[in-house]
Amino acid sequence: MTPLLFPLLLASLLPSSSCNKANKHKPWIEAEYQGIVMENDNTVLLNPPLFALDKDAPLRYAGEICGFRLHGSGVPFEAVILDKATGEGLIRAKEPVDCEAQKEHTFTIQAYDCGEGPDGANTKKSHKATVHVRVNDVNEFAPVFVERLYRAAVTEGKLYDRILRVEAIDGDCSPQYSQICYYEILTPNTPFLIDNDGNIENTEKLQYSGEKLYKFTVTAYDCGKKRAADDAEVEIQVKPTCKPSWQGWNKRIEYAPGAGSLALFPGIRLETCDEPLWNIQATIELQTSHVAKGCDRDNYSERALRKLCGAAPGEVDLLPMPGPNANWTAGLSVHYSQDSSLIYWFNGTQAVQVPLGGAAGLGSGPPDSLSDHFTLSFWMKHGVTPNKGKKEEETIVCNTVQNEDGFSHYSLTVHGCRIAFLYWPLLESARPVKFLWKLEQVCDDEWHHYALNLEFPTVTLYADGISFDPALIHDNGLIHPPRREPALMIGACWAEEKNKEKEKGGDNSTDATAGDPLPIHHYFHGYLAGFSVRSGRLESREVIECLYACREGLDYRDFESLGKGMKVHVNPSQSLLTLEGDDVETFNHALQHVAYMNTLRFATPGVRPLRLTTAVKCFSEESCVSIPEVEGYVVVLQPDAPQILLSGTAHFARPAVDFEGPEGVPLFPDLQITCSISHQVEAKKDESWQGTVTDTRMSDEIVHNLDGCEISLVGDDLDPERESLLLDMASLQQRGLELTNTSAYLTIAGVESITVYEEILRQARYRLRHGAALYARKFRLSCSEMNGRYSSNEFIVEVSVLHSVNRVAHPSHMLSSQQFLHRGHQPPPEMAGHSLASSHRNSMVPSAATLIIVVCVGFLVLMVVLGLVRIHSLHRRVSGASGPPGASSDPKDPDLFWDDSALTIIVNPMESYQSRQVCVAGAAGGQQDDEDSSDSEAADSPSSDERRIIETPPHRY
């Protein structure tokens, strides 16, 4: 088998060897080709044309070109052979090309021959040539404007080279079709021109008095003269001559209580009229002096607020209401603030000397009573008096205290905008120390609260709840000591012994009053209120801040985004905020974040005037602009008033023995007090609902405090000898509440939670003295909060007293029951005007059968009585001439004899006095006219649907 295979293999190799010798050369092509293909087409035009040459031609296979190969990643083209003999080829795109996707393509091409036979054996390849194909653009896209609407503003009377520029773009890839060659204004008769770059200018000076807003349409064309598919609108606003000022602010700013922080100028910007500035300073001033005492504070009374803030008790009021026990303030001029607090006016020529001892609650007391640990607290409104020198000292308080070691002395004075505290620990040995503060609050003629804590040698002054350390401390060792006698004076001070003669001639001094040999000087000129002192434990900073800090003011919190070079300063009372910077845009951003804030849930409604003052510095002082002042106001809206609802049992009756017990009967055993706020809520729109969607109100229950409740009488006052209102005094004192109990009302005063007031009012009891003939009482309960600013509904409770009546034998035997009164037992006059409760009538109402019998018998008796009355009246008319009215001519005549013993009068104590009046009127009408008997019957029938008892006017027997 092997000898046969070898010749066959040799025979197959011999022809191959001869063919390799025939295909001696590889194909040849150009080194580089440049091609062009039209967009959206696939035929590439090459320069030079694609031809491949082979030196083996004209041999078959070896001299023929079988094809071309393209090399490159993602080449969207292919090469095809058109003529193998000539080597002509063609490059075409696999699919239409997009110029916008790719403008040029680069790849390599290589030709290969057909080898040495039909099977392509021993194929040779040419070198690789570079092909550059450029995609020619077609103007398929129209210009498109970047904006559909262009806006600009111009100042009147000026010609602008360029007001604004409109811009259009073209999506084509070639410069010829992608470039915008020119723009055109389509709206005729407009005083504007547009150039080929889209710049718009005015052809004449525009006037603000003429047309204030110009609107026109522009279009664009590319270099292929294709017009924009959508035109653009242009609006040019004509403004008056530029005046440097603040723009984009609102004069009226509404603030809803509970809204937190509200930006005052969210859209404000400074118009400088292109004047370069290098420094801007703005001051925002919020005026709150007209709101209570200088600003919005908690609306509770001073006493209630001290309890809420956790202040320690024990303060002594040095300027109380003038009265028998506080006559030292009688000579001062008295005013009242908006919150009804007492204000005293010191005119610079008067002062008060507070008596020591029980009257003022002061006195010698323990050794350290007012020596080196105490707190002075007061409200002051003080300004610089024009006719007095700036160095004129005015004394607020002057006090000398006696203790175990001797005498100590202190005084608090103001001079100008400075406030000074002089403290002399021991007149005999120690040296005086003077603490000075310079505060703008002292002389701004506005209300401020001051609290001075002395814990010697530390002295801290609080103004509106903000603490201030002394700016300067003097050791005034050369001051002559005052007299060694305990004394306390407000509004002035007494002169020391050594300076007595010197001070007599001063402008701010007078002779001493009777009993005081020393002159008084350094009178105070201003307002004082709430002047108190407390010794021992000092008020903490938190308590003072809670009591007297302002709850409204200017606020700035955006410090994180505060630009470089910006400065922000807020005064302690938050009524003045200052901004300073050098960049206009940064300054605008900072001013837009200045806010108003009021932390009170029930803020005081009203207007807070607002003022913005600006000072600028320019690079050119000659042409520096001036920014006018901005004035506006913040309107604090009326807060949603809390609705205090009192509810419970409004009518009940109890036996008299319950009222006569030692504890009486609770008036409000199941009292419920709720506090809620109703606010406007926008109703959600239901798509299936075809009607009108309106706003509604939603009520949210809140946790709140009450500061007073009153139980008053509806009708006559209480008779102390027969009735009284009772309340547990120990429970009230434990909670710090005050009780006022009179014959007309009972009041509970003091701030406490609703739960506590519910508990206390449920303990309110009504008590009667044993045997008191009272049948009904009405009580009115009402509560209030926030110093009486909000009041509850009037909850009226009607109380009925059920009395037991002994059985009385009736001569007619028609009715005998302990529930009914015989006419011989006329109820006392006290019963008039009172009604018994219907909710507990079962104990006095007979059964249904008895009730029917009573009604029927009563009706029969009424008919008999009416008949007798009719006969009696006729008899009186007949015999009127012969005898006195009402006398019978024949007393023995049984038909004309008036038998009172046969008539039974039944009185229903369950009916009101008014119902009985109606019955009496009806009965009287029946006696006058027989034809009105039907009306009498209706009038004699009470409206009560439980029982009907016939009544006649009472008679004495």
Curated annotation (Swiss-Prot):
Cytoplasmic side residue ranges read 870-957
Which of this chain's residues carry glycans? N299, N347, N508
GO MF terms listed in the record are: calcium ion binding; cell-cell adhesion mediator activity; neurexin family protein binding
Transmembrane stretches in the record are 849-869
Q: Where is the composition biased (Acidic residues)?
A: 928-938
Q: How does it sit in the membrane?
A: Single-pass type I membrane protein
InterPro entries recorded for this chain? Cadherin-like_dom, Cadherin-like_sf, CLSTN_C, ConA-like_dom_sf
Q: Which residues form the Cadherin domain?
A: 29-145, 146-246
Q: Where is this region: Disordered?
A: 919-957
> What's in the keyword line of the UniProt record?
Calcium, Cell adhesion, Cell membrane, Cell projection, Endoplasmic reticulum, Glycoprotein, Golgi apparatus, Membrane, Postsynaptic cell membrane, Repeat, Signal, Synapse, Transmembrane, Transmembrane helix
Q: Which Gene3D superfamilies match?
A: 2.60.120.200, Cadherins
Q: Where is the composition biased (Basic and acidic residues)?
A: 944-957
- Parts of the chain on the Extracellular side: 20-848
* Signal peptide stretch: 1-19
- Its Gene Ontology biological processes? excitatory synapse assembly; homophilic cell adhesion via plasma membrane adhesion molecules; inhibitory synapse assembly; negative regulation of excitatory synapse assembly; positive regulation of inhibitory synapse assembly; positive regulation of synapse assembly; positive regulation of synaptic transmission; regulation of excitatory synapse assembly
Summarize the PTM comment: Proteolytically processed under normal cellular conditions. A primary zeta-cleavage generates a large extracellular (soluble) N-terminal domain (sAlc) and a short C-terminal transmembrane fragment (CTF1). A secondary cleavage catalyzed by gamma-secretase within the transmembrane domain releases the beta-Alc-beta chain in the extracellular milieu and produces an intracellular fragment (AlcICD). This processing is strongly suppressed in the tripartite complex formed with APBA2 and APP, which seems to prevent the association with gamma-secretase.
Any one Pfam family here would be CLSTN_C
Superkingdom classification of source? Eukaryota
- Which CDD domains did the record assign? Cadherin_repeat
Localisation: Postsynaptic cell membrane; Endoplasmic reticulum membrane; Golgi apparatus membrane; Cell projection, Dendrite
Main function:
Postsynaptic adhesion molecule that binds to presynaptic neurexins to mediate both excitatory and inhibitory synapse formation. Promotes synapse development by acting as a cell adhesion molecule at the postsynaptic membrane, which associates with both neurexin-alpha and neurexin-beta proteins at the presynaptic membrane. Regulates the balance between excitatory and inhibitory synapses by inhibiting formation of excitatory parallel-fiber synapses and promoting formation of inhibitory synapses in the same neuron.
Q: Quote the subunit structure annotation.
A: Interacts (via cadherin domains) with both alpha and beta isoforms of neurexins (NRXN1, NRXN2 and NRXN3). Directly interacts with APBA2. Forms a tripartite complex with APBA2 and APP. Interacts with low affinity with KLC1. Interacts with SLC23A2/SVCT2.
Q: Which family does the record claim for this protein?
A: Belongs to the calsyntenin family.
User: What is the official name of this protein in its record?
Assistant: Calsyntenin-3
Organism, by scientific name, is Bos taurus
